[in-house]
């Protein structure tokens, strides 16, 4: 177990003091990390302080404290407090001894080298061995520092050595360190009815200070402690009021933008040494030319493999909203325009308004879109162009090209990426092949589209409902946690696992929570945010941690502490989500849209820019706002209506008006505006009945079934908005709403326009449409009759050996543009461009006798002992797109032995299709969908029923090296772990397709639909 789990940061260097749940410590410097431990010698004996019978340990925003009791203390008590020094690399301990009998106790302090001298990620949790900071069994550099504790004792760590201090010297240093800690921690102060949230302000500020190196925001405070131009750490500067730090960061990376390398080399510019998976690092290519922002500050000659421009620019645009500094807008205008031109050149070269995503978000590793039209990157570019147009107007530049581009992007997103029948955005649309839409969206697709302001209120509500119903939720539980119903989320529902594709990552969870707040769904946002707070900050191994990966992540477990990405997002979700502070200093206003749970009767927040306090007493809500912006902004309070009428609204005791804003989250949204003064008090008095909800639960209805909703007394409805087309017909009366339901099975939403008292609002109605299609009356492979099996001979159509699949070069068709794409060997991705897998069918071939292989299920297949043994199809030019095999006679089942490739980018979409043709001209189709009935030949899917789910029963797979058949080949072959799960030799898949035995068969067509994959048939047996 890793005992060194809570780091304390002081100066803005890599130094940190590692603390534990018991008083044992480590001091990290890159060249000379140390282990520090203490013993206490008393008249009752000597005890190591990390072994006392009683230890109460606390972490308080940059300070670690302990309260110790032990039998040898004979009633005495030892308390310890430790801090990192604020102005140099070092730490200080304060020991207070009380009620010890006899002579004063003696503290025995020891410092030595650490056990693991070769740290991979600076000794971070989950990345380096758990015992890295323990003392060696035989220390070679042991230093001891004994001292008597006469009331209070101070120990100083300086230059990686321990020494005692005089009481006066110790008090001075300790007070100085405590004052610095307190100043940082108190810049964000939060008070709510939820005690789990009241610690967040100071803890967040300390973590944010830990990723500041004096010039830029870092990728992480511990592991990955390095500068990066992108990802979400830099949001924290403005949100937490460090506008000076924010500007320093933005200036440092503005100086890293390429300005003197024109694009002289055309698309595509792929790296042949890396099997065309990613762009070649060569100056003058579209990617490495003017506008590109390099990874390190003040260096515009250093290539990196991510597009970090998008996130950097988004953070910069938020900086303008926080400060309203038009002089700085003018200074940075060339940076923005070069960026926008660079994005267009690289990622929308066909000028269709939708952008490819080239490693432009944290979850980029293993993501590749092959020049596709991607929601999250298009959304980023929409907001950037829309905001650029607004900025241009303010500084006298031409806004037209940026406004036109923004309008073009939004129109294309709504026409091509929004799924009206499903109510969410697609992940992407293929550029190549059939240009199909990949509907199974990741959470980053939803939250980026909402965060970048591409959604109207109806879209935002529907899209967050997709997260409710389609994204895996993992319960957050703990012994003693009284409150139930908390759950964190996976980033996708994709298989197979690959790093950053399906993880439980704190920044992703919190950004999703932010999207709930932005969609008006405060209760859901609060519940998800609290689930993440409980998971990472209270139940995890590191108290107060803003870590990268959750304990609930099946692949990595709890990993990396105080990581830049979650610190930046936590800053936003807390300040901009829960407290709803949304400045627009460019337009001299600040929106306050609180996201408090309905049962909160008070809450307050204080930042360097603004404070506000909310109180509720019976029917009166009061908001007291204090601004500290350079020029006070006009507050615009946006709140959900509580009741059907408003008795009064007052601003600074003067009657004021309110307006209604269109919303779709289930409550009337009201807006109250005030003048820009340093202090504002807004009071709302409600009256009348509480607002009624038409459908609090989600009714389950059959397609073509009927829905009846009672309209409560005092309410009425006048309109219906049915964006998902689930209402075949409906009637609205004074007391009831009745509808006949149509549409695809699954979760759906429509909206009704509701009136009650003074309030008018759109109210969502969620329904679940049952699948009433006749379920198959069989279980696959449950009716095998070997004596009736007839093997099909299609030897002449066999065009490959199954072992060829990853031995080929798949060179065409390829995108004409620079992109991230599948490597030429047909497996891997841009982070693993040289990955391959050895397919070995020797065992299977050895079991073939007289062209027949007998499976353990009793089904025979015609296979070849030598030569070609599979008919491959693919959209790659290596094989035909489709192939038809002649059939005759009648049969009730077609048993297929198949093998081929797939990957996470082709999950939950038909990779291929099998069509059975009958002599009468009719046909039936079976789609091959990863992971339902199609799996990658080289690996076993990790399934845990949580983040990784597949329908039951799992398909039978056939081990090519041994001939074994199993629905759980991983268990059969003792495959462990989550990532890779290589099947030695590979495995095929068995399908049972029920047929209409009253019809004469004509043929079977296999067609590949997905661009990446190769799909083959090895054997067909009719029964």
Protein language model regions, located:
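Acidic/polar, glycine-enriched structural segments that form the non-catalytic walls/loops
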Residues: 73-79, 84-224, 243, 255-261, ...
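Beta-strand-rich N-terminal accessory domains
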Residues: 1-44, 201, 526-529, 771-820
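An extended acidic
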Residues: 1-68, 163-188, 193, 342, ...
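Catalytic cores of carbohydrate-active enzymes
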Residues: 264-269, 348-363, 370-376, 380-468, ...
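Non-catalytic C-terminal accessory modules of carbohydrate-active enzymes
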Residues: 30-34, 40-83, 88, 511-715
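Substrate-binding groove/exosite segments of carbohydrate-active enzymes
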Residues: 181-331, 437-455, 459-462, 483-519, ...
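Acidic, contiguous internal or C-terminal segments within carbohydrate-active enzymes
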Residues: 70-115, 610-616, 629-631, 877-895, ...
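N-terminal/edge-of-domain interface segments
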Residues: 754-1023
């Amino acid at each position: 177990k890793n005992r060194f789990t809570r780091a304390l940061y002081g100066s803005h260097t890599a130094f940190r003091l590692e603390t534990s749940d018991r008083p044992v410590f480590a001091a990290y410097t890159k060249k000379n990390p140390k282990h520090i431990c203490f013993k206490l010698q008393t008249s009752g004996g000597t005890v190591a302080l990390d072994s006392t019978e009683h230890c109460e340990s606390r972490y308080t925003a940059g300070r670690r404290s302990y309260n110790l009791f032990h039998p040898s203390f004979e009633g005495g008590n030892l308390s310890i407090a430790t801090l990192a020094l604020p102005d140099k690399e070092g730490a200080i301990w304060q020991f207070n001894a009380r009620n010890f009998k006899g002579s004063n106790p003696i503290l025995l302090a020891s410092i030595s080298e650490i056990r693991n001298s070769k740290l991979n990620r600076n000794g971070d949790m989950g990345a380096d061995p758990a015992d890295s900071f323990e003392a060696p069994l035989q220390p070679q550099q042991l230093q001891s520092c004994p001292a008597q504790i006469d009331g209070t004792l101070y120990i100083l760590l300086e230059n990686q050595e321990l020494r005692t201090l005089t009481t006066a010297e110790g008090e001075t240093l300790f007070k100085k360190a405590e004052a610095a800690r307190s100043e940082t921690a108190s810049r964000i102060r939060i008070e709510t009815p939820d005690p789990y949230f009241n610690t967040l302000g100071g803890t967040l500020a300390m973590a944010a200070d830990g990723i500041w190196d004096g010039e830029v925001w870092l990728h992480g405070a511990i592991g990955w402690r390095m500068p990066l131009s992108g990802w979400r750490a830099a949001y924290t500067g403005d949100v937490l009021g460090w506008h000076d730090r924010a500007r320093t960061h933005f200036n440092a990376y503005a100086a890293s933008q390429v300005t003197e390398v024109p694009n002289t080399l055309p698309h595509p510019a792929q790296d042949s040494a890396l099997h065309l998976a990613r762009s070649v690092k060569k100056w003058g290519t579209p990617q490495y030319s003017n506008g590109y922002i390099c990874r390190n500050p003040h260096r515009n000659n250093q290539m990196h493999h991510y597009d970090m421009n998008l996130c950097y620019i988004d953070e910069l645009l938020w900086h303008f909203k926080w400060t309203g500094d038009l002089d700085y807008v003018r200074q940075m205008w060339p940076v923005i325009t070069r960026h926008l031109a660079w994005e267009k050149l690289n990622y929308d070269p066909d000028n269709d308004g939708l952008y490819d995503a080239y490693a432009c978000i944290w979850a980029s590793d293993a993501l590749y879109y092959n020049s596709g039209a991607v929601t999250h990157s298009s959304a980023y570019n929409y907001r950037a162009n829309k905001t650029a147009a607004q900025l241009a107007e303010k500084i006298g530049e031409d806004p037209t090209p940026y406004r036109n581009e923004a309008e073009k992007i939004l129109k294309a997103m709504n026409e091509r990426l929004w799924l009206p029948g499903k109510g969410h955005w697609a992940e992407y649309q293929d550029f190549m092949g059939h240009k199909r839409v990949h509907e199974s969206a990741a959470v980053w697709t939803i939250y980026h589209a909402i965060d970048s302001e591409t959604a109207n209120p109806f879209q935002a509500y529907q899209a967050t409902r997709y997260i409710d119903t389609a994204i895996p939720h993992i319960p957050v539980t703990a012994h003693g946690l009284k409150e139930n119903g908390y759950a964190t989320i996976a980033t996708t529902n994709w298989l197979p696992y690959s790093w950053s594709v399906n993880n439980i990552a704190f920044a992703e969870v919190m950004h999703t929570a932010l999207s709930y707040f932005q969609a008006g769904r405060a209760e859901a946002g609060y519940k998800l945010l609290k689930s993440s707070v409980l998971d990472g900050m209270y139940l995890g191994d590191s108290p107060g941690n803003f870590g990268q990966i959750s304990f609930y992540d099946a692949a990595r477990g709890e990993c990396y502490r105080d990581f830049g990405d979650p610190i930046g997002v936590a800053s936003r979700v807390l300040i901009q989500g829960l407290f709803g502070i949304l400045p627009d200093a460019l337009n001299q206003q600040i929106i306050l849209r609180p996201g408090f749970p309905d049962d909160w009767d008070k809450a307050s927040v204080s930042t360097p820019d603004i404070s506000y306090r909310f109180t509720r007493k019976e029917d009166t809500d009061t908001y007291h706002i204090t601004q500290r912006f350079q020029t006070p902004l006009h507050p615009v309070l946006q709140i959900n209506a509580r009741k059907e009428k408003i008795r009064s609204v007052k601003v600074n005791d003067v009657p004021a008006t309110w307006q209604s804003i269109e919303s779709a989250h289930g409550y009337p949204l009201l807006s109250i505006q005030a003048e820009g003064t340093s202090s504002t008090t807004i009071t709302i008095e409600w009256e009348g009945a509480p607002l009624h909800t038409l459908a609090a639960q989600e009714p389950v209805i059959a397609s073509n079934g009927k829905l009846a909703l009672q309209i409560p007394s005092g309410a009425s409805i006048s309109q219906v908005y049915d964006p998902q087309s689930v209402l075949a017909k409906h009637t609205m009366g004074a007391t009831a709403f009745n509808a006949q339901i149509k549409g695809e099975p699954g979760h759906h939403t429509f909206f009704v326009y509701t009136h009650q008292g003074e309030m008018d609002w759109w109210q969502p109605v969620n329904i679940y449409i049952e699948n009433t299609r006749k379920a198959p009356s069989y279980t696959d492979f449950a009716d095998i009759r070997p004596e009736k099996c007839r093997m099909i001979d299609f030897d002449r159509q066999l065009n490959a050996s199954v072992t060829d699949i990853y031995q080929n070069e798949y060179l065409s068709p390829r995108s004409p543009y620079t992109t991230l794409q599948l490597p030429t060997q047909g497996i891997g991705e841009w982070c693993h461009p040289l990955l391959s897998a050895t397919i070995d069918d020797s065992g299977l071939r050895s079991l073939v006798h007289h062209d027949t292989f007998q499976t353990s299920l009793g089904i025979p297949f015609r296979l070849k002992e030598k030569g070609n043994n599979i008919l491959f199809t693919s959209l790659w030019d290596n094989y035909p797109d489709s192939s038809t095999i002649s059939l005759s006679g009648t049969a009730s089942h077609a048993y297929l032995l198949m093998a081929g490739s797939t990957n996470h980018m082709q999950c939950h979409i038909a990779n291929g299709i099998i069509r059975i043709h009958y002599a009468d001209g009719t046909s039936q189709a079976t789609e091959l969908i990863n992971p339902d009935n199609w799996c990658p030949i080289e690996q076993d899917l990790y399934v845990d029923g949580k983040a990784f789910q597949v329908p039951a029963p799992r398909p039978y797979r056939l081990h090519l090296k041994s001939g074994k058949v199993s629905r759980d080949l991983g268990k059969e072959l003792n495959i462990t772990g989550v990532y890779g799960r290589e099947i030695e030799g590979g495995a095929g898949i068995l399908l049972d397709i029920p047929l209409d035995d009253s019809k004469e068969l004509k043929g079977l067509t296999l067609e590949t639909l997905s661009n990446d994959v190769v799909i083959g048939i090895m054997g067909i047996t009719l029964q």
